[in-house]
Amino acid sequence: MRTPLLSTLAIFAAAAWVWIHAAETPRYLVSHNPVLVELFTSEGCSSCPPADALLSKFDRQSRTGAEIVVLSEHVDYWNDLGWKDPYSSHVYSDRQNNYADRLGLSSVYTPQMVVDGTIEFVGSSARSANDAFARAFSAPKIPIHLSSITLVQPDILRAHIETEALTDSFGERDPEVYVAVALDHAESEVSRGENGGQRLAHTAVVRTLLKIGSVQHGQRFAQDVQLKLEPGTDPRHLRLIAFLQQPHQGRVIGVAVHSVGMN
């Protein structure tokens, strides 16, 4: 766990211990109730590479049965400390700050994982992640369907997002609908900062995150969206993610992912 300008031997030792235990066999079994895992990370943080690797492991686990939808959100508050993360955005720093306020944290830190918007922990802790998954897999979710994913222009992606009807069991407030575009895989040669001289690898790197509407109780949500891609983006290596989240970044009550894979 790292906060900029704060680095202690105790924090380093804790990060090292959880990384040693990252190879533990997950305790959760196959589940068809998907969960959303958000990793707040930075290429400028030396404690983050183990968390990046753990997120990649969860992404691979998702393809073998347990439905884990991962997002890597690179914050920008490390950018003045030796290395500017090319995938960072203040959008993700703001999102992390909102979680800190709602979850009662005194400050933000990296690496941090947030599961289904409600459980946060040091992002390199496999044990904490497995405990969070065991709780999250049992929570009910609203099915989300992604379809008609097409590239209408070289830099414009279009998709149809639809949910099943929202029931009273999910509370009285109308959940918000988010859509994200993420790179399947990304790598960087870091020349400066805490990770200087290393080649870092990332999974599901978010490049676009938008709130596109809300779902009213007793109703379905259905909408076509158009998303602008960054210049030079290869759509064959993108994934589209949609999720429902209770207002003010509350509990995630639905999530789906679909490979863009324009072959």
Model regions and ranges:
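Histidine-/acidic- and/or cysteine-rich, low-complexity loops and terminal segments associated
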Residues: 8-11, 23
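Active-site-proximal cofactor/substrate-binding loop regions of enzyme domains
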Residues: 17-109
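Short, conserved sequence motifs used for protein processing/export or organelle targeting and
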Residues: 84-112, 116-263
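Hydrophobic helical h-region of N-terminal Sec-dependent signal peptides
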Residues: 10, 14-18
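Serine/threonine-rich low-complexity intrinsically disordered regions
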Residues: 4-5, 50, 230, 234
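Bacterial N-terminal signal peptides that target proteins for export
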Residues: 1-9
